[in-house]
């Protein structure tokens, strides 16, 4: 069972961006909207991110970096942070997953997992 002081929940919504994609060149652009919510008992700050982006052929791109969209949000208990971003795949379907590296007010460092989610061109999955 996880410690109730350190509970960060992540939800993601995705959409295909046909206007930015070039299927004839195997370029499929997907937007994703992320909500990071602190359901723990202590304030916690997001320090960095780690993503694994896998295309339909199994090729994995690993992304690490500080913060999200240039910020390192501090979330009090019950607070959330939302941001939008995008990614490029060479296939019509893929997945993303990863984690946010957090530090709580008491100095405890922990990872907030981002469960795998699907990226798919509408109609690409049957």
Curated annotation (Swiss-Prot):
Q: Which InterPro entries match?
A: ApaG_domain, ApaG_sf, Uncharacterised_ApaG
Query: What top-level branch of life does the organism fall under?
Result: Bacteria
Instruction: Give the matching Pfam families.
Output: DUF525
Q: Name one GO biological process term.
A: error-free translesion synthesis
Which SUPFAM superfamilies does its entry note? ApaG-like
Q: Could you tell me which residue ranges the ApaG domain spans?
A: 2-126
How is this protein named in the record? Protein ApaG
Q: Which organism is it from?
A: Azotobacter vinelandii (strain DJ / ATCC BAA-1303)
């Amino acid at each position: 069972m996880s410690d109730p002081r350190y509970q960060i929940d992540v939800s993601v919504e995705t959409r295909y961006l046909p206007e930015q994609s070039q299927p004839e060149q195997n370029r499929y652009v997907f937007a994703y909207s992320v909500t990071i919510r602190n359901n723990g008992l202590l304030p916690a700050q997001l320090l960095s991110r780690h993503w694994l982006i896998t295309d339909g052929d199994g090729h994995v791109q690993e992304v690490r970096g500080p913060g999200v969209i240039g910020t390192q949000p501090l979330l009090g208990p019950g607070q959330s942070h939302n941001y939008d971003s995008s990614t490029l795949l060479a296939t019509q379907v893929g997945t993303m997953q990863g984690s946010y590296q957090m530090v709580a007010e008491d100095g405890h460092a922990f990872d907030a997992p981002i469960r795998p989610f699907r990226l798919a061109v509408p109609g690409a999955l049957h």
